[in-house]
Amino acid sequence: MENQPKLNSSKEVIAFLAERFPRCFSAEGEARPLKIGIFQDLVERVGGEMNLSKTQLRSALRLYTSSWRYLYGVKPGATRVDLDGNPCGELEEQHVEHARKQLEEAKARVQAQRAEQQAKKREAAAAAGEKEDAPRRERKPRPVARRKEGAERKPRADKQTSKALRAPREEKHTPVSDISVLTVGQSLKVKAGNNAMDATVLEITKDGVRVQLNSGMSLIVRAEHLVF
């Protein structure tokens, strides 16, 4: 007895029970509904074996009967079995309904976890996109070359006229104050420093607006970075 290996986890206990009572427990596939009061039967049949305690048996049974494959097996017309696989009565309707609710709740929890993980991935991707599209530092203006001695000074009027001709007309943009007015496919601009890049609205989310730039890159942008 002292040299018997010890089972450390509920999964190991379930594997042991499936090997010891194959007509009752299964390690994979759809499980058969268990006899009511089977815990006491287990204590009497395997008590002391593999150094198993009542707490380990109870935890293993709880894990086994809450698994999806077991809940799938609890359905109308199914029959409970004892440790030797003998039928012990058909399932009652209330037990079937309870198992159905447990299965629905378990699926809902998994879907919620997946949705949360997807949201975190989208936020991380959006943050990476904003960093990638962050405006570069503006270059300092080149120092004006000094006029060489003896060189003729051009008339100031001509210089001002040429500057006026070269100066681009500054575009005026209207900031987007409410993203609810936007629609998918609408054209707008994304502010990046002193520049504004053309973009198209792809999706409006709670985190901002997903847009696609002319370069083909898509990212989520907050409203304060959008203008018409």
Swiss-Prot record:
Annotated compartments: Cytoplasm
InterPro entries: ProQ, ProQ/FinO, ProQ/FinO_sf, ProQ_C
Any one annotated GO CC term: cytosol
Keyword tags: Chaperone, Cytoplasm, RNA-binding
UniProt biased composition (Basic and acidic residues): 117-136, 146-175
BP GO terms, sorted: post-transcriptional regulation of gene expression
Highest rank taxon of the organism: Bacteria
Amino-acid biosynthesis found in the keyword field: no
Protein family according to the UniProt entry: Belongs to the ProQ family.
Described function: RNA chaperone with significant RNA binding, RNA strand exchange and RNA duplexing activities. May regulate ProP activity through an RNA-based, post-transcriptional mechanism.
NCBIfam families (UniProt xref): PRK04950.1 (NF003434)
Name of the protein this chain belongs to: RNA chaperone ProQ
Organism: Salmonella arizonae (strain ATCC BAA-731 / CDC346-86 / RSK2980)
Organism placement in taxonomy: Bacteria, Pseudomonadati, Pseudomonadota, Gammaproteobacteria, Enterobacterales
